[in-house]
């Protein structure tokens, strides 16, 4: 009996050791604020940017630190701008300090830079206070903010009271105007209607960055154009479209975007004569 027990024990240990040696495919970190449920996707290599595309220019948006060499690679791959997250919604929400270096690296790589915030509507801090944190954090690093994009996606992350949500968003928009910033909203037809009940009086000066994807990765892409846009809220024309999510470009995970090629300032405009770096204000909106 003892011999049989020993053999059985050795067999179990052998199975456990074999199981431990099998490699497990670990999903990469992807921003939990992605507006779709299929964010746990292993990032695939993104298709190349089409050369000599007259109508649209390409950008990426990201929420993780990116090095100068990676952004130089991005520039060489045909991208013109990056959207950098400047506010992290975790907990009560806080300024994303990683954005400072990424913005500086993007300038040095010759890319235009836009900033977006993923606000925390459940925070004890008002919306305008969250924008204040971005303003103070970036200006302390010598970065001048010309515009900000507010992420309004993932209805489950927002309170169910649309009026309260409208007031929260409006407090950010109003504060941004006080700072002299251009304001944009990152959302979709569905998200906007669910979160704000289709709020249409946000202001005609507010730009739109909409997303439309079928899933994460290359197979989930939609056309890199505005052809699928339908009017909602106060918007009849978009400025930016996110057409792909969770793809690899230059060894880091991004979402991919397009904007009208004639609506962007030159990257050389990223620095004032006093040496301060500009963040935002590159994408001017469709005329």
Regions found by a protein language model. Name each.
Residues 3-20:
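Cleavable N-terminal signal peptides of Sec/SRP-targeted secreted and luminal proteins
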Residues 13-15, 69, 230, 246:
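Secretory pathway export signals and precursors
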Residues 23-62, 199-287:
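Functionally critical loop-and-helix segments that line ligand-binding/catalytic clefts
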Residues 41-182:
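Substrate-binding cleft of extracellular glycoside hydrolase catalytic domains
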Residues 70, 125, 195, 220, ...:
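Short acidic, gly/pro-rich beta-turn/loop elements at beta-sheet edges
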Residues 91, 122, 192, 217, ...:
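Flexible, glycine-rich phosphate/dinucleotide-binding loops
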Residues 146-228:
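Catalytic domains of cell-wall/extracellular-matrix polysaccharide-remodeling enzymes
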């Amino acid at each position: 009996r003892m011999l049989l027990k020993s053999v059985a024990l050795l067999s179990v240990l052998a199975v456990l050791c074999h199981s431990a040696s099998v490699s497990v495919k670990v999903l990469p970190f992807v921003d939990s604020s992605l507006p779709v449920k299929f964010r746990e996707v292993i990032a695939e290599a993104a298709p190349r940017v089409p050369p000599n595309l007259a109508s649209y220019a390409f950008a990426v948006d990201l929420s993780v630190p990116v090095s100068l060499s990676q952004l130089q690679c991005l520039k060489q791959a045909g991208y013109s701008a990056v959207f950098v997250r400047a506010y992290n919604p975790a907990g009560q929400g806080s300024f994303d300090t990683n954005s400072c270096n990424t913005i500086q690296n993007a300038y040095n790589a010759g890319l235009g830079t836009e900033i977006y915030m993923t606000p925390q509507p459940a925070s004890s801090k008002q919306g305008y206070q969250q924008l204040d944190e971005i303003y103070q954090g970036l200006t302390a690093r010598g970065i001048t903010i010309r515009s900000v994009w507010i992420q309004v996606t993932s209805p489950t992350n927002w309170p169910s009271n649309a009026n309260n949500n409208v007031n929260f968003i409006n407090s950010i928009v109003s504060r941004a105007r006080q700072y002299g910033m251009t304001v944009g909203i990152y959302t979709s037809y569905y998200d906007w209607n669910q979160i704000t009940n289709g709020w249409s009086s946000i202001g005609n000066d507010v730009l739109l960055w909409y997303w439309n994807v079928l899933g994460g990765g290359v197979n989930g892409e939609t056309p890199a154009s505005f052809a699928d846009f339908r009017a909602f809220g106060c918007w009849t024309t978009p400025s930016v479209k996110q057409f792909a999510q969770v793809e690899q470009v230059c060894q880091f995970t991004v979402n991919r975007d397009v904007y009208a090629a004639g609506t962007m300032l030159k990257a050389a405009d990223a620095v004032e004569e006093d040496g301060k770096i500009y963040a935002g204000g590159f994408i001017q909106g469709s005329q």
